Amino acid sequence: MGISKKSQLVPLLAFITMFLMVVSRVSSSIADANSLHFSFSQFSQNPKDLILQGDATTDSDGNLQLTRVSSDGSPQGSSVGRALFYAPVHIWEKSAVVASFDATFTFLIKSPDRDPADGITFFIANTDTSIPSGSGGRLLGLFPDANIIKNSTNLDFNAAYNADTIVAVELDSYPNTDIGDPSYPHIGIDIKSIRSKSTARWNMQTGKVGTAHISYNSVAKRLSAVVSYSGTSSTTVSYDVDLNNVLPEWVRVGLSATTGLYKETNTILSWSFTSKLKTNQLQDLRIASVV
């Protein structure tokens, strides 16, 4: 007795359906594993999901104070502080494009000085990053002091290199022309160096809440930043860079700030971040086929 074509198609269709379900499930789980999102509308006084370094603290008003302030909220000089999200970010993978990401934070800078200093950064660094020695003031808590690197006979060169493996967007309130700063407050993009690759004049407004938005387009390989205050025009800066060639595969994201002889409050009111590493579809199919 012959077997109908319809009866032959049933098991084939069932197999195809099951295969597509496996592919979909595997692809979805990989995408989830390579995504990260967090959002702080305020900061608790004992944040378990932040790594606080140096003088960084959270206060009773739900703010993140990156640099030291007195009991009455006045800024203190010679202070360095950083805050990093506890979970690492998968920024690139051999079988994938580099992750795209968006970060936004709101901030408040206040100063009794005519010239506030020194600034705030959003940065990406090694997962084990710590505040480098001598990185206060103009170095924004990110890079070791050049004199320490050149002159120390006890230098751990691997540690020095790792400390420099940083990508950052700086909101630089005090121009240090001796390290390549323009002669005015500016927004800059730093690639493994405190000497910014690209800058734009920043009309900084003390005592007003500002918003910084940083994004990376992994297709265009463009890092961009927009800083604005309500009711004013924004400052925009961008630079083309392949993060695959600059950063390790796994990183942490953070905020840093410093003060020096001159001082300012470096208060963070909110902070959010989203990253997405899109895997190669053919790689997903190969993984699914062996499940």
From Swiss-Prot:
Mn(2+) binds at residues 170, 172, 181, 186. Residues 147-162, 281-291 form a propeptide. Binds one manganese (or another transition metal) ion and one calcium ion. The metal ions are essential for the saccharide-binding and cell-agglutinating activities. This is Lectin. D-mannose-binding lectin that also binds alpha-methyl-D-mannoside with even higher affinity. Has hemagglutinating activity against rabbit erythrocytes. Shows toxicity against the brine shrimp A.nauplii. Induces reversible paw edema and hypernociceptivity in rats. The mature chain consists of residues 163-280 followed by residues 29-147. Concanavalin A-like lectins of the Diocleinae subtribe undergo proteolytic processing referred to as circular permutation. The propeptide is split into an N-terminal and a C-terminal part, the gamma and beta chain, respectively. These are then religated in beta-gamma order to form the mature alpha chain. The beta and gamma chains can often be detected in cell extracts. Residues 1-28 form the signal peptide. The record marks 147-148, 162-163, 280-281 as: Cleavage. GO terms for molecular function: D-mannose binding; metal ion binding; toxin activity. A carbohydrate binds at residues 138, 174, 228. Disulfide bonds: none annotated. Pfam families: Lectin_legB. Belongs to the leguminous lectin family. Hemagglutinating activity is stable after incubation at 70 degrees Celsius for 1 hour but lost at higher temperatures. Ca(2+) binds at residues 118, 172, 174, 176, 181, 208. Optimum pH for hemagglutinating activity is 8. Activity drops with more acidic and basic pH and is lost at pH 5 and pH 8, respectively. The lineage of its organism: Eukaryota, Viridiplantae, Streptophyta, Embryophyta, Tracheophyta. PROSITE patterns: LECTIN_LEGUME_ALPHA, LECTIN_LEGUME_BETA. Keywords: Calcium, Hemagglutinin, Lectin, Manganese, Mannose-binding, Metal-binding, Signal, Toxin. It comes from Dioclea lasiophylla.
